[in-house]
């Protein structure tokens, strides 16, 4: 097996089966959370559901049906709701950033400090392994915080959303140097490569075309516990060329 090039545009790709677990607000789905530097896109493969969001313009619900493409930008608190066997392909900007902490769940304020957030967000059970019970527990905590944020918004208190954003920024600030390196090595490098190719073509230099190749990654065999559901993350190390 040979390492393959990164995905086009340095995006991340995952197959997502949205959690079927019931929530306290009579829905089924995962943990509401927000990305601070990455846009995210859902390509709906099968099933039926909704994307519930809250941003600086207020709460919104977007239907999810097979064939739909829905995307949202940093600052969008979001959760996927599973109405019927919802499966999507997730396209994530800046591959590697969500794994490096660019995702903050909407826990109540007392769990949004650097001291309290890690334990609340942890998936590890008593045996030290990722646990579905822990995934449900942190989901329930995030839903409680999200429900309160929506309630505050509808009461006219816009500052609750802003306070969450400020707390999220404080949580991720120690990681920003790592994020910058990831973007420099990924999306920015990909953009520079494209610009070099364009510059070469202006001078009739098309030698990069002789480096053309085809890569393939099979469906990952193992699922992991994500924020929104069961994930199968496609990683370049698992591909062939």
Regions found by a protein language model. Give the residues of each.
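Conserved short histidine dyad/triad with adjacent acidic residue
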Residues: 2, 15-35
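A short beta-loop-beta micro-motif enriched in histidine and acidic residues
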Residues: 27-43, 57-58
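Short, conserved beta-strand element in jelly-roll/cupin
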Residues: 36-51, 91-95
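Short acidic-glycine-tyrosine-enriched beta hairpin
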Residues: 54-75
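Acidic/histidine-enriched, beta-strand-rich ligand/metal-binding domains
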Residues: 64, 76-77, 81-89, 94-108, ...
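Double-stranded beta-helix
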Residues: 85-157
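An accessory alpha-helical subdomain
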Residues: 126-205
């Amino acid at each position: 097996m040979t390492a393959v090039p990164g995905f086009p545009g340095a995006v991340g790709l995952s197959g997502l089966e949205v959690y079927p677990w019931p929530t306290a607000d009579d829905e089924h789905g995962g943990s509401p959370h927000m990305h601070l530097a990455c846009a995210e896109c859902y390509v709906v493969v099968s099933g039926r559901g909704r994307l519930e969001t809250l941003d600086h313009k207020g709460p919104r619900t977007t239907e999810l049906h097979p064939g739909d493409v829905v995307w949202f930008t940093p600052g969008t608190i979001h959760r996927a709701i599973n109405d019927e066997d919802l499966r999507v392909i997730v396209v994530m900007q800046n591959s590697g950033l969500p794994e490096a902490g660019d995702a903050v769940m909407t826990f109540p304020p007392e769990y949004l400090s650097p001291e309290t957030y890690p334990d609340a967000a942890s998936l590890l059970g008593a045996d030290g392994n990722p646990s579905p019970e822990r995934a449900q527990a942190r989901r329930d905590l995030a839903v409680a915080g999200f429900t309160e944020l929506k309630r505050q918004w509808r009461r006219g208190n816009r500052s609750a959303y802003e306070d969450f954003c400020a707390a999220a920024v404080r949580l991720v600030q120690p990681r920003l140097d790592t994020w910058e390196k990831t973007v420099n090595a990924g999306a920015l490098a990909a953009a520079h490569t494209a610009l070099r190719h364009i510059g070469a073509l202006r001078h009739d230099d098309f030698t990069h075309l002789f480096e053309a190749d085809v890569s393939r990654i099979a469906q990952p065999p193992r699922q992991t516990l994500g924020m929104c559901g069961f994930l199968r993350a496609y990683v370049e190390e698992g591909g062939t060329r």
